[in-house]
């Protein structure tokens, strides 16, 4: 792929006028306290853009707002060439709000002692609550705009709302008003289950769904056809099954991803079959997994989550060859 992402063909994002890259960057780990310094994140974001990615998905709570700040810092002068999607609906626990301004001091200490995210007690992380009230949504969107250094979001999404909240539609009026004010261009729902996704489709103003789809998790695929009929874009996340489709077989404990031992056993057999399929084709399992989701009819953007340059390099070298990225965009554009 060339050095200018404008050379990369795009897909239409549902019935909107947004044109997006087939792969987007999930920014949940951008700015994390357990990772590198901010300049490295900026370089990572800029490099992903140079390699053809123009869709960036973040949220107000990701890295206590640092994810949005780094996106704003990186793309302030290239705002019209990217698609910014953010989310809101969660409330940061007091512990995390307190730690946020201390990140520059804590990051080198954490790196020195080798502390990982998994080693942090829940009492320090705190429990996330939710708020989808008009006041909170407006305050959150305006906060995101400040951090992203922009006057509008291309896409705003409710962040994992319960089905009852989606069903109520109490949030629609607020988001429609913010569309009229020019603060958001489109809005959608990031869903945790199929039921929420199907309910979201009943609201005519919804322009997108974000759902989990992978070789190992296909339940939400039932939303693809009705979304396509309505012209609703679909953003696929967790396409590598939270790492299960990139880790070595010896490193994967499927029980961590499943509700029961029986489900874990079934997915274990599926995983073995997919490993063999990738081997037979002479490609990595990660590439097989990404191709599967990318080529699903109705998927507009396939999110990949990276937080280090070596991860991005490996992804493009092994799993997203340039010719595949361009060819898949061309196929979608023709459909």
Where are these regions (language model features)?
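Short, acidic/polar
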Residues: 35-48, 132-148, 191-199
């Amino acid at each position: 792929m060339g050095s200018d992402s404008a050379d990369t063909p795009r897909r239409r994002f549902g019935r909107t006028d947004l044109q997006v890259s087939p792969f987007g960057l999930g920014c949940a780990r951008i700015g994390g306290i357990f990772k590198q310094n901010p300049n490295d994140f900026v370089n990572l974001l800029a490099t992903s853009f140079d390699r053809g990615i123009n869709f960036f998905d973040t949220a107000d709570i990701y890295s206590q707002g640092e994810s949005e700040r780094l996106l704003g810092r990186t793309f302030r002068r290239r705002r019209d060439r990217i698609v910014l999607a953010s989310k809101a609906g969660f409330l940061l626990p007091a512990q995390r709000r307190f730690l946020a301004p201390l990140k520059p001091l804590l990051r080198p200490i954490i790196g020195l002692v080798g502390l990982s995210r998994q080693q942090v007690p829940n009492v320090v992380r705190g429990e996330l609550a939710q708020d989808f009230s008009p006041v909170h949504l407006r305050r959150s969107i305006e906060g995101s705009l400040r951090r992203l250094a922009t006057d509008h979001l291309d896409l705003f999404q409710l962040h994992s709302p319960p089905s009852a909240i989606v069903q109520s539609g109490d949030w629609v009026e607020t988001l429609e008003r913010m569309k009229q004010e020019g603060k958001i261009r489109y809005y959608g729902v990031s869903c945790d289950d199929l039921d929420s996704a199907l309910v979201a489709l009943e609201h005519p103003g919804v322009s997108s769904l974000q759902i989990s789809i992978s070789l190992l998790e296909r339940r939400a695929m039932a939303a693809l056809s009705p979304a396509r009929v309505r012209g609703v874009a679909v953003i696929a996340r967790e396409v590598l099954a939270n790492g299960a489709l990139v880790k070595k077989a010896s490193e994967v404990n499927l029980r961590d991803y499943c509700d029961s031992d029986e489900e874990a056993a079934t997915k274990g057999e599926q995983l073995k079959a997919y490993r063999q399929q990738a081997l037979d084709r002479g490609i990595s399992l990660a590439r097989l997994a990404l191709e599967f989701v990318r080529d699903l009819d109705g998927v507009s953007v396939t999110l990949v989550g990276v937080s280090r340059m070596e991860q991005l390099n490996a992804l493009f070298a092994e799993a997203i060859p340039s010719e595949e990225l361009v060819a898949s965009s061309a196929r979608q554009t023709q459909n």
